[in-house]
Amino acid sequence: MNLPPLTPATLIRRYKRFLADCALASGEIITVHCPNSGSMRSCAEPGQPILISQSGNPKRKLPWTWELYWSGASWVCINTQHPNAVVAEAIAAGDIPALQNYAQLRREVPYGSHERVDVLLSSEGRPPCYVEVKSCTLLEEDGVIRFPDAVSSRALRHLGALTEVVRGGGRAVMLFLIGREDGRGFAPADAIDPAYGKALRRARTDGVEILAYRTRLSPDKISLSVAEPLLF
């Protein structure tokens, strides 16, 4: 997916989950919207370069949005609204072998108990395929990318909903999209959210398919890269 025009800045601090202060090249300090509810461990170090986009909506309280963070080795996707679009675009292009040959792709379709699946794939004569996408940015000291970066009851609930899809005769896929180019492999963050790690393993045993893919990032574009090994 193509990114909007981006402006360089330097991160000063991220606070109250959805706010960040940064300095523009001119020296002006502004507050930007941070579209990420996680802890953002390993991708919110003050003093690092970031890229921000400006909204054309005059009604927005904060016209700027934090899009990318420079880790020192890779750009990191901060905006959690992008992964779903990247995955949907890749599926439509046939770039994910496990999700090829479906006639219809729909996004944000209601299912389960008050849930909305990120992507629903369907074809006549085949069980529907429910795909949940999780954005992963946490890089641990061992070089492994992990999820979640904070305890997440919502992510846990999604695993339960996918398991129910399988029990009902459908196909369910949990796809972890790694929003950075450094690190290797994927595993659940057991030290941060042990309940999620246990639930992910249980869901896999119950028939939920687990995929992990890396992204290719630049100041202009985010696209699907290669599949990553599951290290659990």
UniProtKB/Swiss-Prot annotation:
Gene3D superfamilies referenced in this protein's UniProt entry, alphabetically: 2.40.50.580, 3.40.1350.60
Coiled coil residues, start to end: none
Origin: domain of life: Bacteria
GO molecular function: DNA binding
InterPro entries for the chain: SfsA, SfsA_C, SfsA_N
Pfam family of the protein (one): SfsA
Family classification: Belongs to the SfsA family.
PANTHER family to which the protein is assigned, alphabetical: SUGAR FERMENTATION STIMULATION PROTEIN A
Protein's name according to its UniProt entry: Sugar fermentation stimulation protein homolog
Source organism: Acidithiobacillus ferrooxidans (strain ATCC 23270 / DSM 14882 / CIP 104768 / NCIMB 8455) (Ferrobacillus ferrooxidans (strain ATCC 23270))
